[in-house]
Amino acid sequence: MAKNFQSVLLLVCLSFLVIVSSPQNAVQADTLIGSCVWGATNYTSDCNAECKRRGYKGGHCGSFLNVNCWCE
């Protein structure tokens, strides 16, 4: 009886770990695509529009002094 209980408990724990670690439950991070600063190599005049053009929901300039274009 004890071995059967341990087996069931192990199965429940493993099932929980598989569900929790599945990719669809992960939070998707923003993606850095370039710079929002004049004169930079990857300058994007409109970060939000460029992100939408690439298939993201939108974008924003962020990080220290808002120098990076992040898509979400």
Curated annotation (Swiss-Prot):
SUPFAM superfamilies the UniProt entry points to: Scorpion toxin-like
InterPro entries, A to Z: Defensin_invertebrate/fungal, Scorpion_toxin-like, Scorpion_toxin-like_sf
UniProt entry keywords in alphabetical sequence: Antimicrobial, Defensin, Disulfide bond, Fungicide, Immunity, Innate immunity, Secreted, Signal
Induction entry: By bacterial infection. Induced by A.niger alpha-1,3-glucan.
Domain of life of the organism encoding this protein: Eukaryota
GO biological process, any: defense response to fungus
Disulfide feature: C36-C61, C47-C69, C51-C71
Location in the cell: Secreted
Stretch forming the signal peptide: 1-29
Tissues of expression: Hemolymph and midgut.
Family designation: Belongs to the invertebrate defensin family. Type 2 subfamily.
Function of the protein: Has antifungal activity against A.niger (MIC=2.1 uM), C.albicans (MIC=8.5 uM), C.fructus (MIC=8.5 uM), F.oxysporum (MIC=16.9 uM), P.pastoris (MIC=16.9 uM), P.tannophilus (MIC=8.5 uM), T.harzianum (MIC=4.2 uM), and Z.marxianus (MIC=8.5 uM). Lacks antibacterial activity against the Gram-positive bacteria L.monocytogenes, M.luteus, S.aureus, and S.lutea, and the Gram-negative bacteria E.coli D31, E.coli ATCC 25922, and S.typhimurium.
Protein name: Defensin
